[in-house]
Amino acid sequence: MHILRLATSTIVLLFWGVIAAAQPGADDTWWPSEWGTDDERGAANRLGSDKVLEAVALIREGRIYELGRDYEAGMPIFPGRHYSLTIPGSPTHGPMGENQLVGHDELVSAQIGQVGTQFDGLGHIGTRIDGEDRFYNGFKRREFGTPYGLGRLGVEKVGPILTRGILIDVAAYKGVDRLAVGEVISADDLRNALARQGTGIREGDVVLIHTGHGRLWMVDNDEYNSGGPGIGMGAARWLADQKIVMTAADTWAVEVIPGEDPDMAFPVHQELLVRHG
């Protein structure tokens, strides 16, 4: 089996993985950002040395939990996406030198959106308003979008992330192994699950949501890809009000699919990424 292990932060994933009106108008704006008109970092601005020290002080046993997925042939991939890994000759190099060195290289072809573990940067999602595509902090797509990379809102602007992580086990709160595809997680669900765990959210935290949907990975890929449980708009807005840095889930979308409103396309992505960074 061809498997590629990619190094990922344990808290920036969307496989373990954000409501605007149907026709937004010019008065429906979310900019400038609270961090200034030129800000491209978004909610990561909530992270400072105090938050890092707070997170490090929580370590007691030094255990490491790997949340990323293996990139491998046959994994569930969002329709239209692609992933392949090949070894161009075995060995790719050598033998070389008197010591007869041999080696392998990998050739990877892929789209990173909805392929394995991923992180949605702020240039991923925007909203069209009166013919103008606007992203986080009101940046206009026509001024930074190119076929060879984004001139603004790249993930490199976010910077390193070391902070306190909170796992909200919604599946355990509801007494099931796995929430159903299309099951909406409400703000009350999150609050009640946190109360059950005796856990609270602090500004600058990362929130991980366990639905059990990840159990389907490489077991029933068709069901995994068919949709998923996830947060609805109420939960998304509540999380934003808690001033978190980011959220993640063991689903491919984080938000509920099919969505609460069949006429809306990924509104939770718009709420969290575009409006709240």
Write out the residue ranges for each language-model feature.
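N-terminal secretory signal peptides that target proteins for export/translocation
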Residues: M1-L4
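Bacterial N-terminal signal peptides
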Residues: A7-V18
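Active-/binding-site microenvironments in catalytic and ligand-binding cores
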Residues: A22-G277
